[in-house]
Amino acid sequence: MMSQTELLRKKSHPVDQALTPEEIQQYLTVLDGWSLQGLHIAKSFEFKNYYQTIAFVNAIAFIVHTEDHHPELEVGYNRCVVKFYTHSVNEGLGGISENDFICAAKIDALAGNQFAPMSH
């Protein structure tokens, strides 16, 4: 199984097939706080204030633009929920791919280094 460090070194790339449910569960064990929510992997990040939340969203925008793999974001005053899903896999039916986990790992690294989510 791939480690978070190995995911950080990878770059998103075109894929045709989604991961199997077993593969998804294996990847979820590598990333802290991410969970399967319907057809997405998702994680909620909390911040001290609106400014930190929006700074985090802007930093995410840079990462996902570079990776060419864009999440759905739910943004509130002090919270951002990030959801990944790959629309292009399974002949356009969609699913979860390694690209979702690559980007999730990069967002976790960003949050851990610069935006440290508040503990509950």
From Swiss-Prot:
> Which one GO biological process term can you cite for this protein?
tetrahydrobiopterin biosynthetic process
Q: Reply yes or no: does the keyword Lyase apply.
A: yes
Catalytic reaction(s) noted: (4aS,6R)-4a-hydroxy-L-erythro-5,6,7,8-tetrahydrobiopterin = (6R)-L-erythro-6,7-dihydrobiopterin + H2O
Query: InterPro entries given for it?
Result: PCD_sf, Pterin_deHydtase
Under which EC number(s) is this enzyme classified? 4.2.1.96
GO molecular function (one)? 4-alpha-hydroxytetrahydrobiopterin dehydratase activity
Q: Name one Pfam family in it.
A: Pterin_4a
SUPFAM superfamilies cross-referenced by the UniProt entry:
PCD-like
- Alphabetical keyword list: Lyase
Q: Which NCBIfam families match?
A: PRK00823.1-2
User: According to its UniProt record, which protein family does this protein belong to?
Assistant: Belongs to the pterin-4-alpha-carbinolamine dehydratase family.
The protein depicted here goes by the name Putative pterin-4-alpha-carbinolamine dehydratase
Instruction: Say which species the protein is native to.
Output: Bdellovibrio bacteriovorus (strain ATCC 15356 / DSM 50701 / NCIMB 9529 / HD100)
